Curated annotation (Swiss-Prot):
It catalyses: GTP + H2O = GDP + phosphate + H(+). Mg(2+) binds at T26. Gene3D superfamilies: P-loop containing nucleotide triphosphate hydrolases (3.40.50.300), Translation factors (2.40.30.10). The lineage of its organism: Bacteria, Bacillati, Bacillota, Bacilli, Bacillales. It is found in: Cytoplasm; Secreted, Cell wall. Residues 174-176 are annotated as: G5. This is Elongation factor Tu. It comes from Listeria monocytogenes serovar 1/2a (strain ATCC BAA-679 / EGD-e).
Length: 395
């Protein structure tokens, strides 16, 4: 069958495989590409091609991740698979691979294991919104009752972490048998992809979200006003729009965008991904600074206190060589600026070691525009020592 041309018109969704080590995440990834390749929807990838993922660096952190792409009748997918547990933790916290949904792989022969639980918790904390379950290795379990028991266990575990355990699709299959071309098991991969297609919604595009632009630089043009430059993170901004200047200062200010410029050309509007200069009326050069954001009024608010799921770099990654304790005061780098914050460790935790993954409570010395899911780096004197994602805002 001739290869179908890559279709840009299909909606794009980012997904990934998660679950306990050796439950079959990589085998499933290989099976999906192999089964879809028969329809001309993917390039078949062997297990070894996926497993030998190259190391990447994201915010100074070394992560091994395999990226594959494929399509179904209705969508185009980018799929990430990580070889090691630590790679998942780092990946999900840095947002190196932003997932719109995940396929949780659980071995039917073993049932949920410690990392099954950890990956579900991480998904909840970093905001992976939807999970579909693939019960793998069902060819090794003859007892129908045992399969039902494992399914119930998985559903209970998902419910425990506030996912809709009763409604989540659970597909029972065998990635290895599908990879080997056995038709009955291949059909289960099709069933899985149908569940992913229908259960994981198409994400809202960045351009459709409310406008936000982190301010990188500010200067004034005599007779015209103040210009703030930066890359539009989401949404669109048009000439004449009212925007809010948020962060650092206690009070947010409303200003009007009187001009949008990109590559020295004037535009009517700018959208997510554009590097622009926004000409602002009614604001002095000294009233706006790097580290603030311009945003659609009311869409994001400044905060000082939050909880965050964090990963602390190892010495080998260029991080700290020693643990840190309660009241640790590093800088938190949000988008374009560092703000000092005071760290409170969870009750019963004496110290945090390099390489740990932990939920910290943070109090910043100045308010910053943040929301659940906002990513940041933890730095000491310009050197990255950790990465985190806001999981809960308290003030």
């Amino acid at each position: 069958m001739a290869k179908e041309k890559f279709d840009r018109s299909k909606p794009h969704v980012n997904i990934g495989t998660i679950g306990h080590v050796d439950h079959g995440k990589t085998t499933l990834t290989a099976a999906i590409t192999t089964v879809l390749a028969k329809k001309g929807y993917a390039d078949a990838q062997a297990y070894d091609q996926i497993d030998g993922a190259p190391e990447e660096r994201e915010r100074g952190i070394t992560i091994s991740t395999a990226h594959v792409e494929y399509q179904t009748d209705s969508r185009h997918y980018a799929h990430v698979d990580c070889p090691g547990h630590a790679d998942y933790v780092k990946n999900m916290i840095t947002g190196a691979a932003q997932m719109d949904g995940a396929i949780l792989v659980v071995s039917a022969a073993d049932g949920p294991m410690p990392q099954t639980r950890e990956h579900i918790l991480l998904s909840r904390q970093v905001g992976v919104p939807y999970i579909v379950v693939f019960m793998n290795k069902c060819d090794m379990v003859d007892d129908e009752e045992l399969l039902e028991l494992v399914e119930m266990e998985i559903r209970d575990l998902l419910t425990e972490y506030e996912f809709p355990g009763d409604d989540i699709p659970v597909i029972k299959g065998s990635a290895l048998k599908a990879l080997q071309g056995e038709a009955d098991w291949e059909a289960k991969i099709d069933e899985l992809m149908e569940a992913v297609d229908s259960y994981i919604p198409t994400p809202e595009r960045d351009t459709d979200k409310p406008f936000m632009m982190p301010v990188e630089d500010v200067f004034s043009i005599t007779g015209r006003g103040t210009v703030a430059t930066g890359r539009v993170e989401r949404g669109q901004v048009k000439v004449g729009d009212e925007v809010e200047v948020i962060g650092i200062e206690e009070e947010s200010k409303k200003v009007v965008v009187t001009g949008v410029e990109m590559f020295r050309k004037l535009l009517d509007y700018a959208e997510a991904g554009d590097n622009i200069g926004a000409l602002l009326r009614g604001v002095a050069r000294e009233d706006i600074q790097r580290g603030q954001v311009l945003a659609k009024p009311g869409s994001i608010t400044p905060h000082t206190n939050f909880k965050a799921e964090t990963y602390v770099l190892t010495k080998e990654e260029g991080g700290r060589h020693t643990p840190f304790f309660n009241n640790y005061r590093p800088q938190f780098y949000f988008r374009t600026t560092d703000v000092t914050g005071i760290v409170t460790l969870p009750e019963g935790t004496e110290m945090v070691m390099p390489g740990d993954n932990i939920e910290l409570a943070v109090e910043l010395i100045a308010p910053i525009a943040i929301e659940d899911g906002t990513k940041f780096s933890i730095r000491e004197g310009g050197r990255t020592v950790g990465a985190g994602v806001v999981s809960n805002i308290s003030k």
